[in-house]
Design a protein with these regions (language model features):
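Radical SAM enzyme [4Fe-4S]-AdoMet core and its adjacent flexible, acidic
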Residues: 1-118, 122, 136
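Cysteine-cluster motifs in flexible loop/terminal segments that predominantly coordinate metals
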Residues: 124-140
Length: 140
């Protein structure tokens, strides 16, 4: 499944129309509108999302009790093969390993990956970047 998201609902200054026109002209599909955005074709969607502060290692700590679904029901793989706990770590700050160098099951079972998921279950993130993530605050 592929889901594109425009993370600017309510504050797009009209730019969503420009982005939407561009995508419709470059991605073939039926583009059926629904409550979350559009179903472009089977297993291919565009969704709207509320704006938030992206995680930044230099940002202030957002809170000590933080929950997130990172490593609990998803993870990310960057274009260079770096595995990260979520797609918001686009810089690979929390580098769990590399799929071009080791097996993904070994990476996901590593002590660091396990600590991340256990930390979120306890609402006590093991990673500094996660404590500075504005997106995670919506779950906390």
């Amino acid at each position: 499944m592929v889901v594109f998201r425009l993370w600017n609902r309510g504050c797009d200054d009209g730019r969503n129309d420009i982005a939407l026109d561009f995508l419709k002209n470059h991605i073939p599909g039926q583009w059926t509108e629904n409550t979350r955005g559009f179903r472009i074709r089977e297993k291919f969607y565009l969704e709207w999302g509320d704006r938030f502060q992206w995680p930044d290692k230099d940002a202030p700590i957002q809170g000590e009790r933080v929950f997130c679904y990172g490593m609990l029901d998803h993870f990310g793989i960057l274009c260079d093969g770096t595995v990260v706990p979520c797609c918001l770590d686009s810089e690979g700050v929390i580098n769990l390993g590399n799929v071009f160098q080791e097996n993904i099951s070994d990476i996901l079972a590593s002590p660091r990956a396990t600590a991340i998921s256990e930390g979120f279950r306890r609402r006590c993130p093991s990673e500094e970047l996660c404590r500075r993530c504005g997106y995670a605050q919506r779950f906390s």
